[in-house]
Every structure is written in C-alpha cells, then in structure tokens.
C-alpha cells in the first residue's frame, strides 16, 4: 500500500510522529504504519476511540460549541468541544511534558485518578497542611468525586488522548491547589488559570462564557477580585500539566503553591 506524502516543515512533521525523507531534494513527511501500543491505556483507547473525518471534526466542534453555549450544563458537549478543538494545544503540552523529567515520568506511567487508583483512606490520615489532605477536604466540602470525568473518544493520537484525560482528571487537583470551590465563581476563575497555563481553547471558552452567567453580585466580585487574581496566577504559575500530583500527597501545600508560583485569593 502506498504511503501518503505530506509536504510539511520538518519540525512539525517530526512533532506529529511522521517520517521525514528527502525526495527530489525536498523534505517530505510520510505517514508510517501505526506503532504497536506500548501500554494499557493506549491499547484500551485504540479499541474505544471513535474515528472521525476532518469534516466531521469541524462539524462536531461547531455543533458542540453552540450546544455548550446554549446550555453550559451539557458536559458531554463541553468534552466534545475540548477534543475537537484542542489538538494544537495538546501538542504544545506534549512538548512541555517531554521537556520535564516529572512530565516524562507521567507519560511513561500514565497514572489515572479515580477512587480505584487513589488510596483515599491513606490521604485521610495525612496532616491537614499536606496536599493530599487538602484534596480529600476539597472533595468532601464540594461533594464531588474523581469518577465523574467523561472518557476521551475523538482524538486520533493516543498520547494526546491521554493528555486530555489527564487534564480532566487533574481538574479537581487544580481547584485544590488554587483553593477554589466548585461554585460558578470558582469554576470561572479556575478556567482562566487553566486557559493561560495550558492554552486549551475550551478553557478560554469556559472562562469567557461562564462569566456571562454570573449574577450581578458575583460579577462585581469577579471583576474586582477573582479575574485579576486568576489572570495573574495563570500567567505567573509554572506549567501544571507536568506536575506528578500523586507523588506530592505528603508535600506541604503551602510549599507546593510556592514552588508552582501560585497565590491564594483572600476571599474575606
């Protein structure tokens, strides 16, 4: 079977996992046969992913953005929007992961965050000023569970699919380290931090359109306190995706915030 040839800049071709060869004096990228999956996540994902054409991707992206705008409670549409618009940002995140020793370990291990993989009984025994204890307290105070995240289905590259999965499963951990609740104000503020930190379009959309739904009193607090704080932390903080949160349970949460360049908003 003939391989499809693509005339792409060499760095972009290599970034997308293509082979680069010289043809008539020009660098040409050729699609290689799909490599054998290297781990359980990739094997499972390749069984369950839904393959879509470029046209379907555009159609799904447009449709899900309209549906999410009309009804922000449609988490399925928000998830679809993230997958159909986030590939370029995910490629940049992948570069960031590969440039960090901690990020490389995450990509090698591909840890998952739900009740079947995290020892929450152990976290409950940790001192209250540790990250693990703060995470458990966040889950209880906000009555949320790590098992509620939707599975990724529409991304072609399993590595990018894992990064989107990782982003979703770490969302509550970002809430924890930012000390933000899951109410509308907290969600919009966290989305701004995530948008500036990851570059994911869906985060920008959630931040902008989520703010529209704030009530007048909330909007005043948002503009005066939450938005300036979120923008400052989003721009100043270190990349959060390469943080191996599961290795930080015992770390003092104040030291962790200092390491990541995060400050907590004084809500008084």
Swiss-Prot record:
GO (cellular component) term, any one: extrinsic component of mitochondrial inner membrane
Pfam families, alphabetized: Coq4
Broad class of enzyme this protein falls into: lyase
Cofactor(s), names only, from the UniProt record: Zn(2+)
EC number: 4.1.1.130
Keyword vocabulary terms for this entry: Lyase, Membrane, Metal-binding, Mitochondrion, Mitochondrion inner membrane, Ubiquinone biosynthesis, Zinc
Membrane topology summary: Peripheral membrane protein
Compartments reported by the entry: Mitochondrion inner membrane
Disulfide bridge map: none
One GO process term, biological-process aspect: ubiquinone biosynthetic process
Reaction it catalyzes: a 4-hydroxy-3-methoxy-5-(all-trans-polyprenyl)benzoate + H(+) = a 2-methoxy-6-(all-trans-polyprenyl)phenol + CO2
Chain residues that bind Zn(2+): 171-172, 175, 187
Pathway terms, separated by semicolons: Cofactor biosynthesis; ubiquinone biosynthesis
HAMAP family found in the cross-reference section: Coq4
Family: Belongs to the COQ4 family.
Quaternary structure, from the entry: Component of a multi-subunit COQ enzyme complex.
Other remarks in the entry: This protein may be expected to contain an N-terminal transit peptide but none has been predicted.
Role noted for this protein: Lyase that catalyzes the C1-decarboxylation of 4-hydroxy-3-methoxy-5-(all-trans-polyprenyl)benzoic acid into 2-methoxy-6-(all-trans-polyprenyl)phenol during ubiquinone biosynthesis.
Protein name, UniProt field: Ubiquinone biosynthesis protein COQ4 homolog, mitochondrial
Originating organism: Drosophila yakuba
């Amino acid at each position: 079977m003939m391989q499809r040839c693509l005339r792409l800049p060499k760095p972009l071709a290599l970034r997308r996992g293509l082979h680069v060869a010289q043809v008539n004096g020009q660098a040409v990228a050729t699609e290689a046969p799909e490599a054998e999956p290297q781990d359980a996540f990739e094997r499972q994902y390749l069984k369950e992913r839904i393959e879509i054409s470029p046209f379907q991707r555009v159609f799904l992206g447009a449709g899900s953005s309209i549906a999410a705008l009309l009804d922000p409670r449609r988490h399925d549409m928000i998830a679809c929007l993230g997958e159909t618009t986030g590939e370029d940002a995910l490629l940049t995140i992948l570069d960031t992961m590969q440039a960090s020793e901690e990020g490389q370990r995450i990509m090698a291990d591909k840890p998952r965050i739900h009740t079947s993989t995290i020892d929450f009984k152990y976290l409950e025994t940790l001192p209250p000023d540790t990250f693990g204890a703060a995470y458990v307290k966040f889950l209880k105070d906000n009555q949320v569970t790590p098992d509620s995240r939707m599975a990724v289905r529409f991304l072609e590259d399993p590595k990018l699919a894992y990064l989107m999965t990782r982003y979703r499963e770490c969302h509550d951990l970002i809430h924890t380290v930012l000390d933000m609740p899951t109410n509308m104000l907290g969600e919009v503020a966290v989305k701004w931090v995530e948008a500036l930190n990851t570059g994911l379009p869906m985060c920008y959309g959630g931040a902008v359109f989520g703010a529209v739904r704030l009530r007048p009193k909330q909007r005043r607090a948002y503009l005066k306190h939450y938005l300036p704080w979120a923008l400052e932390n989003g721009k100043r903080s270190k990349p959060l995706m390469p943080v191996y949160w599961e290795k930080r349970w015992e770390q003092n949460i104040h030291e962790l915030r200092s390491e990541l360049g995060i400050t907590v908003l004084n809500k008084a």
